[in-house]
Each structure stands twice: as structure tokens, then as C-alpha cells.
């Protein structure tokens, strides 16, 4: 059985809610800038790859199963299931390889940018 709370014993806060508290000038803009900077931005290319591979993981193994059970193995579902499993694993492996290549490309671009910044700083020091 649930116990009843006595509301008089509970502590009551007297501070106004955060949205009604007085703000300093510029505080709101600073918070908005932080929130916008912290939003995750995913490149459209990455999202399209994810969508395409998701559809491929659903469609290709099922297609491989039904094609192989009807036309290749003449009703043997064991081999057809193995074919579907191999197809799904190949798609997953190819997605991992593509993701690793993309990540290496991003790391190389970051190194190049750092080198360019270093070269610019050196030229500024020389002047």
C-alpha cells in the first residue's frame, strides 16, 4: 500500500523557474551560440550511405534467399538460408570498409588543415 506524503513537511523552493529568472544582457545569445555549436551535424553523404546500406541489408538477403531456394537449390532451405546469411555479412563487411575509408579520409584532411595552419603561422613569424 502506498504511503501518503505530508505536503507541509516537504521543502518548498521559492526561486522562480529558470525561464522566468532575470537574465544578464548577452546571456541568451551566448547560450544560443553554445547550443548551435554543440548540435551534431552529419554530412548528407553519410546519411545517404546509411540509408542505402540499411535498405540493402533488408532487401538483398531476402532476395538472395528466395532466388536461391526457388532457382538454385530447388527447395533446399538450408543452403538458401546460408546464402542469405553470407549476403548479409558481405553487406555488413562492405559498410565497415566504406566507413573506415571515409574516416581515414577525414583524418587526412584534418592533418592537411593543421599543416596549412602551421605553414601560415610560420610565414607570419618570418614577416
Swiss-Prot record:
The keyword Transport does not apply. Residues 1-28, 107-127 are annotated as: Disordered. Residues 118-127 have a biased composition (Basic and acidic residues). One of its GO terms (biological process) is vacuolar proton-transporting V-type ATPase complex assembly. Residues 67-79 are lumenal. Keywords: Cytoplasmic vesicle, Endoplasmic reticulum, Membrane, Transmembrane, Transmembrane helix. GO terms for cellular component: endoplasmic reticulum membrane; endoplasmic reticulum-Golgi intermediate compartment membrane; ER to Golgi transport vesicle membrane. It holds the Pfam family VMA21. It is found in: Endoplasmic reticulum membrane; Endoplasmic reticulum-Golgi intermediate compartment membrane; Cytoplasmic vesicle, COPII-coated vesicle membrane. The chain crosses the membrane at residues 46-66, 80-100. A motif (Prevents secretion from ER) lies at residues 124-127. It is a multi-pass membrane protein. Residues 1-45, 101-127 are cytoplasmic. Belongs to the VMA21 family. HAMAP family: VMA21. Required for the assembly of the V0 complex of the vacuolar ATPase (V-ATPase) in the endoplasmic reticulum. This is Vacuolar ATPase assembly integral membrane protein VMA21. It comes from Coccidioides immitis (strain RS) (Valley fever fungus). The gene is VMA21.
